[in-house]
Amino acid sequence: MPKKKVLLVLLLLPLVSALLLSLPFLVEGVWFIALIALLPLLAAEEIATRRGIKGFWAIYYLAFLIWNLLTTWWVYLATPPGAIAAFTINALQMSLVFGLFRRMRRLTGGFLPYLFLIITWLAWEHCYFNWHVSWPWLVLGNSFATSLSIIQWYEYTGVLGGSLWVLLTNALLFRIIKMKCNGERVALSALSAALVILLPIVASLLIDASLKREIEQEGESGPRAVFAIIQPNIDPYSDKFGGMSQSAQTTQLLQLSAEALDNMPTLGDSSTIVLSPETFLSPDGSRNSLLLEYAPLENSSFRRIYDFATNRGVDYIVGGVTYSIDETAAKRNTHNTAAMIFREGAIEYYHKSKLVIMAESTPFVGIFKPLEKFAIDLGGSVGSFTTQKERSIFSTSNGVKIGTAICYESVYGDFYREYILKGANVMSIITNDGWWGNTPGHRQHLHYASLRAIETRRAIARCANTGISAFIDKSGRIVAASEWWKPQYLNGSLPLEERLTFFVTNGDVIGRVALFLFWLLLIMGVVRALTRGKLSPQGKE
């Protein structure tokens, strides 16, 4: 093949992979594409290796950058600097993983380099969830977020089980293609690939069938929490932070809350919890608009919600920007907070602890501080929110122990399970997805909540300012949902669960094992290269 055609093929194949990787995130029901999405990229790498083409890392980077752009372009609408950082850094890390794989192929042959690729990618995903600067939206296991019946085993593996499935299937299929091209027998390899593809599906369908029977038998019996989810639908750009007074927003919220409670069916002794969205209460620049945790009732809007909750005899979770005093550092901290107003009058707070980069947290301040002026202002505290060290939950007098994940926190499975370890028997998520407009962003965020329900087997009440609010059962299915960009409420009840899944108890086992194996294989590879004299300045690409 002429060199120009080779270069064209080397450019087109990675672009095909970028498109295939994007489709499961953008189109519901095409999960199977993820199982072949890496084949064009692996084929391009094989051609580049055989032709001795240098600088192939740039092609990796282009492919992963396009994948990030196609799938998460909508982030730019909310935070341009954060989006640029997410796109470029994500693509850089992904391409570095494949660069290490390419280096390993120079050191050894057979299937070992592909095993190294699988392990390295899983180790990277595991670490990425825990780094201060992270954007794990495109974890490969998230490809199946709209195809829940085939991933019910996430309660054992977490989302990295899906990533392992994608990587292993692609590697095995590519091995079969190579063997076929070399005239080798592929029957045994084909059987192995078929088992890797089919066994997880069969196992999931069996778990799913059992869960459906369990949910049907439970019905409305057993201990439950009753929810009124309030979706005020306040435009985050034109109204939320300046165009509409906080008093007017609170009036709208309480009117919907009253309507929801007036139409709430009575369910025995079940606790009723009213759920409102993230950062509903936000300062407008005046001191009286500040929500001080040590004197919350001085805030007139919070006082109105407090009076509503105690007079109506309900527990009320409201999102807001709050302020606390750090006595050790003699300074005031700003938090993205879920405040629980108990029917008896007590107040507790939970502070969001996975922050959105460049909107709520500014990494490497010396470099990125000037970019804060381009970020979202959630009430005069761009890039300076304070977190809390451990998860905490709210326990009502009726036995409901509810965890409240705030927005971005629901993307982190290993983090999210900590609510259940603290005793949560039901979960809530409060968010404001209106920043992204009517794009794939808010729908992807909703579907990721389903993954958390599967991993923890905790039903979820999800409240989004502009939608989509929803009730999600423990199998991850959305049993009721609001419309997008419409003020409304949802009434419903969710069962209280006490069982701990394997994933909740043990966490991301796959990621931890992959990280250990990565270092082990890396050391083995370096030792092997040194003994063969293959590591030299001339050998570098």
Where are these regions (language model features)?
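Short, solvent-exposed loop/turn segments at secondary-structure junctions
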Residues: 76-77, 283-284, 325-327, 435-438
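Non-cytosolic juxtamembrane linkers/loops
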Residues: 3-5, 196-267, 432-445, 450-457, ...
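Membrane-embedded alpha-helical bundles of multi-pass enzymes
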Residues: 2-212, 438, 449-453, 463-464, ...
